Amino acid sequence: MVVTAQHLITPPYSQAYLSDDVADLAQIYQPAINICLVERQVDSELSHFVGHLLKHPNPISFIESIEFASFNFFGLLPHTGHLPGYRAFCKDVAALTALYCDLFELKRVGLRLHTLDHAMCPKFHVDSVTCRLVCTYGGIGTEWLEDAYADRRKLGSGSGGLSDELSGLILDNNAVHKMPPYAIGLLKGGLWEGNEQHGAIHRSPSLTQESPRRLLLTLDFGQ
């Protein structure tokens, strides 16, 4: 079951909370919620910049533990600084990082920003983290599976080497969803206290000829 911002029921399993209001990211603190997804619209300047990055053959990979207060977000991807929309992109990454830090009272975060031309994690899984922010800036978004329609015994080695579609993990194919581009996703992991058995089940999407690359931002609790 998926709930909207207008309708929230506490079930015996975890739910996804869907909204278009950034303030609703705080719903991730609800014990019954393991995914919080906020859809948003971005301006054309930002989307054109992202489109250029995805068309460029050179890969992008930025992985660093940063202190939010001192990190220079306008130093991200300096080789693209001449492109229209660069500052809008940097401001957006900074804004998402600020939201994440404020929500969880963090001073440091692990920031990852990279282009992908393959499914990095092609099988459904649960991350061994407290809570991860995921935003696909361009390309196909991360897929997630509703908790009520997952047989968690089939995760990992429980799949017997079979694909998600054949292992019995997915109890209803209609319960598999894709995060829209630019949506802000919060995924509770297995390290969230009290949520150890209900971490958000998700996977990388299969890419297509029409959309062969994606630009992914993730934020994690810093050390």
Q: What positions do the PLM features span?
A:
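N-terminal auxiliary "cap/dimerization" subdomain that precedes the catalytic jelly-roll/cupin core
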Residues: 1-80, 87-91
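Short, surface-exposed beta-edge/turn micro-motifs
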Residues: 32-35, 130-133, 182, 213-214
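A structural signal for short, well-ordered beta-strand segments and their strand-loop junctions
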Residues: 36-39, 108-114, 135, 186-187, ...
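Short helix/loop capping segments that flank catalytic or ligand/cofactor-binding pockets
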Residues: 46-47, 144-146, 188, 195-196
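Extracellular-facing segments of soluble proteins and assemblies that are Gly/Ser/Thr-biased and enriched
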Residues: 78-126
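Active-site environment of non-heme Fe oxygenases that use a 2-His-1-carboxylate facial triad
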Residues: 113-115, 137-151, 201-204, 216-223
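Catalytic core of non-heme Fe(II) oxygenases with the double-stranded beta-helix
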Residues: 118-181
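Catalytic core of Fe(II)/2-oxoglutarate
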Residues: 168-223
